């Protein structure tokens, strides 16, 4: 493998990491409050609102049901308006964020559902407001589950970023498609696959360590 190709792969790793973590961050900025809203408005919860819950849940389900490659193409006009282009690293972050947010929202809701209802009832009996319950009971108790959700999300985004590379998003996906598939270079294709596997392994390893660190003994 030539030196220019090696540097291209290094840049591809950097672009893949940037797409994954930046879109993961913005995905959580959107998905975390939506997930909390889904939980607290469920029937029987602290601010139960069946109509609001059904509406938000339906929107989340709609976006979750769209395959990412279709979402990527569908969002090209919106991406161009937001970042001024429909190709490249910055452009990829927009559909990646939109694709991740509803997934994160459901993961957050599921993590909160694991919390014993007795803790919430005790907090309500002590006069805690809904916001206090969310900040001081729900989120701290669900922290291991939230970290696990973040790990799964980041791993999913690694795969999404590779798909985005096939339509000019950059990263390892574009290198694998352009130089490996189109260029019939098996060495490049296999190297890209190995690098993606390593990235996934490292993210999972770090996530597992953090979960163990925040899990209360």
From Swiss-Prot:
Topology relative to the membrane: Multi-pass membrane protein
Keywords linked to the UniProt accession: Amino-acid transport, Cell inner membrane, Cell membrane, Membrane, Transmembrane, Transmembrane helix, Transport
Keyword Glycoprotein: no
Protein name: D-methionine transport system permease protein MetI
NCBIfam families noted in UniProt: PRK10782.1 (NF008049)
Species, as recorded: Escherichia coli (strain K12)
Spans traversing the lipid bilayer: 20-40, 58-78, 81-101, 152-172, 186-206
The family this protein is said to belong to: Belongs to the binding-protein-dependent transport system permease family. CysTW subfamily.
Periplasmic side: 1-19, 79-80, 173-185
Chief subcellular location: membrane
Localization terms from the record: Cell inner membrane
Residues in ABC transmembrane type-1 domain copies: 13-204
Gene name, Swiss-Prot/TrEMBL: metI
Keyword match Transmembrane helix: yes
Alphabetized InterPro entries for the sequence: AA_ABC_Transporter_Permease, MetI-like, MetI-like_sf
């Amino acid at each position: 493998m030539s030196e220019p190709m090696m540097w291209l792969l290094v840049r591809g790793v950097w672009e893949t990491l940037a797409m994954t973590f930046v879109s993961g961050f913005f995905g959580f900025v959107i998905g975390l409050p939506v997930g909390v809203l889904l939980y607290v408005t469920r029937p029987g919860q602290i601010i139960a609102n069946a109509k609001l819950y059904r509406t938000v849940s339906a929107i989340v389900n709609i976006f979750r049901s769209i395959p990412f490659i279709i979402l990527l193409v569908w969002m090209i006009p919106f991406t161009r308006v937001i970042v001024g282009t429909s190709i490249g690293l910055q452009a990829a972050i927009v559909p990646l964020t939109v694709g991740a947010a509803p997934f994160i929202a459901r993961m957050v809701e599921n993590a909160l559902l694991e919390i014993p209802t007795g803790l919430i009832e005790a907090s309500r009996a002590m006069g805690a407001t809904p916001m206090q319950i969310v900040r001081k009971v729900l989120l701290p108790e669900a922290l291991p589950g939230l970290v696990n959700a973040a790990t799964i999300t980041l791993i999913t985004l690694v795969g999404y970023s590779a798909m985005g590379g096939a339509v000019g998003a950059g990263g390892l996906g574009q290198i694998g498609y352009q130089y490996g598939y189109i260029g019939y270079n098996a060495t490049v294709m296999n190297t890209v696959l190995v690098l993606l596997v390593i990235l996934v392994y490292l993210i999972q390893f770090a996530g597992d360590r953090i979960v163990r660190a925040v899990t209360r003994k």
